[in-house]
Amino acid sequence: MKRPEKEAVVAELTEQFRNASAVYLTEYRGLTVPQISDLREKLGRDTSYTVAKNTLFRIAAKEAGIEGLDEMLKGPSAVVFVDGDFIEAAKVLRDFAKTNKALIVKGGFADGTVYDAEGAKQLADLKSRPELLAELAGALKGTMSKAAYLFNALPTKVVRTIDALRDKQEKAA
C-alpha cells in the first residue's frame, strides 16, 4: 500500500475510533472467510469488523485520542467498531469465540476505559440496557402494586377502627 492509501485508511479508521461507543480487538488467525462473514452478520448493523495492519490501527487510535491499545495490537488483529449497544456486541463476540476457538478477544475500549481480555469477558456478562430496563419496569410495577394495596388498606383499617370504637362506646353506654 502506498503512503496516500495508508493515510486514507488511517483517516477512515480514526473516524471509526472517534464515532464508536466501544472498540474490541480480536485475533482472527485461523478463521475462514465464511466464519468471518458469519461473525459480521451476528454482530449486526451497528458494528463493523475491520481488518488492517496493526501500525495503521495504532496511528488511528492515537489520533482519535485512545491510548493503551498498543499491547493488544500484536499478531493478526481485527477491530470491532461498535456504534450501538457495546454490551450486546461483547456477548456476540463471547458466544462466537465459544464455538469458534480461533477467534480470540484481546480486549477493548468503552466509556473511556481500556479493557484487557478478562475485562471484555466481564462486559459480556453484564446485562444489556433492555434487560436492565425490563427489570426496572418489573420492580416499579411491583412497588406500585404494593403502594396501591397500602393506599387501599389504610382507609379500610380506619373504618374498622372507627367501627370498633363505636361498638365499644355502644357497649359501654
From Swiss-Prot:
Pfam families: Ribosomal_L10. Keywords: Ribonucleoprotein, Ribosomal protein, RNA-binding, rRNA-binding. Transmembrane segments: none annotated. The keyword rRNA-binding applies. Gene3D superfamilies: 3.30.70.1730, 6.10.250.290. The keyword DNA damage does not apply. One of its GO terms (molecular function) is large ribosomal subunit rRNA binding. One of its GO terms (cellular component) is large ribosomal subunit. It comes from the Bacteria. One of its GO terms (biological process) is translation. Belongs to the universal ribosomal protein uL10 family. Forms part of the ribosomal stalk, playing a central role in the interaction of the ribosome with GTP-bound translation factors. Part of the ribosomal stalk of the 50S ribosomal subunit. The N-terminus interacts with L11 and the large rRNA to form the base of the stalk. The C-terminus forms an elongated spine to which L12 dimers bind in a sequential fashion forming a multimeric L10(L12)X complex. PANTHER family: 39S RIBOSOMAL PROTEIN L10, MITOCHONDRIAL. NCBIfam families: PRK00099.1-1 (NF000955). This is Large ribosomal subunit protein uL10. It comes from Bifidobacterium animalis subsp. lactis (strain AD011). The lineage of its organism: Bacteria, Bacillati, Actinomycetota, Actinomycetes, Bifidobacteriales.
